[in-house]
């Protein structure tokens, strides 16, 4: 199939391009209280727990809505109102964590580095030693605004040594970058259906340390986002408290089957790494410069400096590339002009090469010569 005949490929961090099998799974209607759907939900949660190695220590709590809904639910449920959160920031989604704490009226402090500088374990060591009031540390594992990968395992060890609790937004890493609950201590790790698992958007999920979840009754600011109540009701009835995203759950169930058939996390990581390597190499041939050095670049999404040519306008560039069958993502940095290209979804290295060819053609048509 030519690029002109197919739907545009989403080179974005989610929603992303899904397989035909995943889309076909949404063609069935489910009763939200039906036992078959309850079994589907239970199967999804069990398979998700297996990916993170949390079967003996953590509980998977699904929640309707975007990933941010689940992040807000995790903070609102697991952080008591007299707790204090240290928020680690090196991009837009770290800033969103701080905004959530502000809106929920949870005391918090922030530590912010440049957008191309990961937070270090030494930073966290110093910050926790200086402020004993901190009860929780919250961070983004892979900061989607750049693609930077923060050193989760090293930070988690520091947090544990200080007797604090860790909340991890793993939205753009879970399923493609290894996180083992048996080695990385955390109270909550949050992800969503429409990212590296290649499902469709509409459902978040929180891996909550079971003891912390049980102890959190009464913390939450919200009825709908109370993870402790959601889990208690599910454990008792097998059902969601409120109308579930039935088609999204069915699509994720099918996407997980394909994930397992592909070879699980190691195979998914290899494919995304190949996509990323291909993208970086082909874009370099066109003259593009990536924003991050290779050692902190996650194989999820790559940020590129925009062309220096005065004829470059992102809106025109985006539209030309879209007409050739690929959808890119605008930049999300504050200091320099950039754009982003995702490496995830139901795509492989061949399609990454096609995408870069389309980018090159678009630049020539727009007479953008200085990259």
Swiss-Prot record:
Involved in phosphonate degradation. InterPro entries: Aminotrans_V_dom, NH2EtPonate_pyrv_transaminase, PyrdxlP-dep_Trfase, PyrdxlP-dep_Trfase_major, PyrdxlP-dep_Trfase_small, SP_NH2Trfase/AEP_transaminase. NCBIfam families: PhnW-AepZ (TIGR03301), PRK13479.1 (NF010006), transamin_PhnW (TIGR02326). This is 2-aminoethylphosphonate--pyruvate transaminase. One of its GO terms (molecular function) is 2-aminoethylphosphonate-pyruvate transaminase activity. Keywords: Aminotransferase, Pyridoxal phosphate, Pyruvate, Transferase. Its EC number is 2.6.1.37. It comes from the Bacteria. Its cofactor is pyridoxal 5'-phosphate. Homodimer. Belongs to the class-V pyridoxal-phosphate-dependent aminotransferase family. PhnW subfamily. GO terms for biological process: organic phosphonate catabolic process. It catalyses: (2-aminoethyl)phosphonate + pyruvate = phosphonoacetaldehyde + L-alanine. It holds the Pfam family Aminotran_5. The modification N6-(pyridoxal phosphate)lysine is found at residue 195.
């Amino acid at each position: 199939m030519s690029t002109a005949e197919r739907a545009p490929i989403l080179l974005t961090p989610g929603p992303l391009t899904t397989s035909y099998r995943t889309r076909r799974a949404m063609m069935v209607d489910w009763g939200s209280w039906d036992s078959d759907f309850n079994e589907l939900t239970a199967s999804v949660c069990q398979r998700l727990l297996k990916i993170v190695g949390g079967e003996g220590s953590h509980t998977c709590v699904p929640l309707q809505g975007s990933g941010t809904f689940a992040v807000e639910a995790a903070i609102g449920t697991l952080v008591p109102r007299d707790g204090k959160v240290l928020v680690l920031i090196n991009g837009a989604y770290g800033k969103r964590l701080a905004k959530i704490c502000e809106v929920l009226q949870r005391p918090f402090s922030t530590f912010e580095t440049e957008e191309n500088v990961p937070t270090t374990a030494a930073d966290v060591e110093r910050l926790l030693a200086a402020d004993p009031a901190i009860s929780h540390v919250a961070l983004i594992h892979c900061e989607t605004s750049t693609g930077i990968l923060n050193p989760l395992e090293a930070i988690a060890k520091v947090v544990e040594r200080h007797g604090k609790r860790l909340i991890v937004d793993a939205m753009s890493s879970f399923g493609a970058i290894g996180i083992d609950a048996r080695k990385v201590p955390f109270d909550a790790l949050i992800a969503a259906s429409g990212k590296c698992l290649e499902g469709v958007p509409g459902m978040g999920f929180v891996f909550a340390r079971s003891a912390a979840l049980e102890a959190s009754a009464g913390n939450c600011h919200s009825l709908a986002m109370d993870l402790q109540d959601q889990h208690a009701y599910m454990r008792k009835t097998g059902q969601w408290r409120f109308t579930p995203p039935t088609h999204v759950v069915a699509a994720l169930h099918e996407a997980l089957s394909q994930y397992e058939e592909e070879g699980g996390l190691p195979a998914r990581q290899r494919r995304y790494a190949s996509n990323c390597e291909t993208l970086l190499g082909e874009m370099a041939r066109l003259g593009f410069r990536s924003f991050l050095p290779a050692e902190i670049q996650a194989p999820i999404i790559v940020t590129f400096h925009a062309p220096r040519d005065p004829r470059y306008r992102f809106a025109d560039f985006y539209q030309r590339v879209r007409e050739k069958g690929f959808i890119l993502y605008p930049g999300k940095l504050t200091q320099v002009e950039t754009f982003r290209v995702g490496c995830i979804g139901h795509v492989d290295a061949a399609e990454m090469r096609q995408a870069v060819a389309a980018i090159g053609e678009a630049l020539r048509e727009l007479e953008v010569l200085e990259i």
